[in-house]
């Protein structure tokens, strides 16, 4: 099944680059990044988005590694510098806001809001896979997302979220904090980014924890 993931590069005001949800890296990508700046922050924003952190650490040994709580339990061998939380660290305070999502059973994630571009950056809180998605002709992908998960052309949280919320009140508080941000677009790890009606589409996708 062709299920790809997107990495996001954010340039901070001082010129440092932050890589969010590291993807596979090779010499060609390293050269492309070098034309933009230097990676100083490696961010594993969720407990399913850490697989290539070690590769990026080898490519950028002086970078600081930040991980979502829970990753350290899944990868006890992974070196990291700091755990992410609800407060932005000094490295990007005033530029990027963040929320550690609580109230979930199987999946953990930190949401980020880049103020200057008014962009919300998520991993699994929204997946937007459908007819326009690259790789949409994959038969297994379409079977699972359309027939099983009923998420085809319908942005929703990842199936791991839908399996159950441990504390919907806590989750609702976190989601409302995210919706209070003044974002215009949503960059996500899986599927097509949301460029229009972002607030309304997210509120609809999160209807279950928001209204329960």
How should these model regions be labeled?
Residues 18-23, 42-45, 96-102, 162-167:
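Short, flexible loop segments at the rims of nucleotide/cofactor-binding pockets, characterized by
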Residues 18-19, 68-210:
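Metallo-beta-lactamase
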Residues 26-30, 50-54, 107-109, 195:
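Short, well-ordered alpha-helical microsegments
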Residues 32-92:
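Active-site HxH/HxHxD metal-binding segment of metal-dependent hydrolases
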Residues 3, 28-33, 130-136:
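A short, polar/proline- and glycine-enriched secondary-structure boundary/capping micro-motif
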Residues 1-28, 110-114, 118-123:
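Conserved beta-strand hairpin/beta-sheet module of binuclear metal-dependent hydrolase folds
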Residues 19-21, 40-47, 66-68, 121-123, ...:
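Active-site neighborhood of phospho(di)ester-bond hydrolases with catalytic His/Asp-centered motifs
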